């Protein structure tokens, strides 16, 4: 299969591109009523859960905690809507995508334009060993790790620790880093951060007037932290799994990356609903213009996708063992693999 490279960051199309493009084309059209219904069946239950959490404090904090877990699930679903708006796939209208992207960005504590810009780079570079570090999980090759300084090795081991990766890092990212403008992010991205911060401040003031600022923070911070942790876990499993595709830029192929470098995370139907079908990540990377509510149908209706081995809820936990990319053997390995290298 030969590839024609269009340049760094551009898609790489194969000779079979016309066939897969024809396959995905009919699923790329947003349907206004479906999008509106998705907003309704996500925003309204999320608001109701906030009301119930306030009322439940008079009964039991454990009941409040259970409700907050469900609320975190709805916040993940809101993030998927936010995500689709960023890809321009939720509505046909650019203005509608921008408006609802901003609104859901405030609710999910994520600046719309800044996130969209870095996420677009992720789509352009996912699975490319020469363009890591943009919108992805820090992953070193075995060779890079062995050549790294002791300090870098310690930092990397800490960064790849599951507690740091799925608890501390998501909280820092969504609660702190997404609030801070920098020169590196650029003017438009920083404006996005400023306006998102203003929106969050306005939301916090209104909610504090309704329920008190202590109660608001007692709900908001845990809900954001839980949804952020689960969201990062989803993202991790989508690109760090057994059999994943990584390649150097000169050999990197767009279609192969989508179908082999992005997982088919087959979740139970309830979890699939809360995560907005993002488990069909191979379809999403093949065509980010497909709305989340069309991803499953695209997968099920086309033979091209039927031989892709799914990752299940339970098998996904195998990904926790992966720490490094073994470039020589084209696979992810754990730190224990380094001990085997020393013995050999």
Predicted regions and their residues:
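Non-catalytic, topology-defining segments of multipass membrane proteins
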Residues: 1-72, 106-221, 293-344
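Short helix-capping and inter-helix turn/linker motifs at the boundaries of alpha-helical repeat units
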Residues: 14-15, 93-95, 133, 272-274
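Active-site-flanking alpha-helical
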Residues: 49, 86, 90-91, 246, ...
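Membrane-embedded alpha-helical segments that form the functional core of polytopic membrane enzymes
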Residues: 56-82, 99, 103-113, 224-229, ...
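Transmembrane alpha-helical segments that form the membrane-embedded catalytic/substrate-channel core
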Residues: 72-82, 111-115, 163-177, 220-250, ...
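Histidine-centered catalytic micro-motifs
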Residues: 78-87, 115-127, 234-243, 274-290
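Aspartate-rich (DDxxD/NDxxD/DxxxD) Mg2+/diphosphate-binding motifs
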Residues: 81-99, 124-141
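Cytosolic juxtamembrane regulatory segments of multi-pass membrane proteins
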Residues: 253-271
């Amino acid at each position: 299969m030969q590839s024609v490279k269009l340049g760094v960051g551009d898609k790489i199309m194969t000779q079979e591109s016309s066939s897969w493009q024809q396959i995905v084309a009919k699923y790329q059209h947003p349907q206004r009523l479906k999008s509106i219904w998705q907003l309704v069946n996500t925003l309204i239950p999320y608001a109701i859960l906030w009301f119930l959490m306030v009322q439940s404090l008079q009964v039991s904090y454990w009941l409040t905690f259970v409700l907050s877990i469900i609320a975190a699930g709805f916040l993940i679903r809101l993030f998927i809507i936010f995500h689709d708006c960023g890809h321009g796939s939720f509505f046909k209208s650019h203005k509608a995508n921008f408006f609802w992207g901003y609104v859901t960005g405030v609710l999910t504590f994520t600046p719309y334009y800044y996130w969209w810009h870095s996420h677009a780079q992720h789509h352009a570079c996912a699975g490319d060993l020469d363009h890591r570090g943009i919108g992805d999980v820090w992953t070193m090759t075995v060779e890079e790790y062995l050549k790294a300084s002791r300090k870098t090795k310690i930092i990397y081991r800490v960064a790849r620790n599951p507690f740091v990766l799925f608890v501390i890092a998501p909280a820092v990212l969504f609660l702190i880093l997404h609030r801070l403008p920098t020169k590196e992010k650029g003017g438009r991205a920083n404006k996005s951060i400023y306006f998102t911060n203003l929106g969050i401040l306005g939301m916090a003031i209104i909610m504090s007037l309704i329920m008190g600022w202590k109660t608001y923070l007692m709900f908001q911070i845990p809900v954001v932290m839980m949804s952020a942790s689960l969201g990062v876990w989803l993202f991790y499993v989508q690109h760090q799994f057994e059999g994943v595709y990584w390649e150097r830029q000169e050999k990197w192929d767009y279609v192969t990356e989508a179908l082999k470098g992005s997982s088919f995370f087959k979740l139970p139907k309830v979890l699939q609903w809360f995560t907005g079908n993002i488990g069909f990540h191979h379809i999403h990377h093949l065509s980010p213009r497909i709305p989340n509510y069309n991803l499953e149908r695209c997968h099920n209706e086309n033979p091209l996708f039927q031989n892709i081995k799914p990752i299940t809820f339970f098998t996904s936990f195998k990904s926790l063992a992966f720490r490094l990319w073994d470039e020589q053997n084209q696979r992810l390995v754990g730190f224990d693999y380094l001990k085997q290298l020393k013995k050999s």
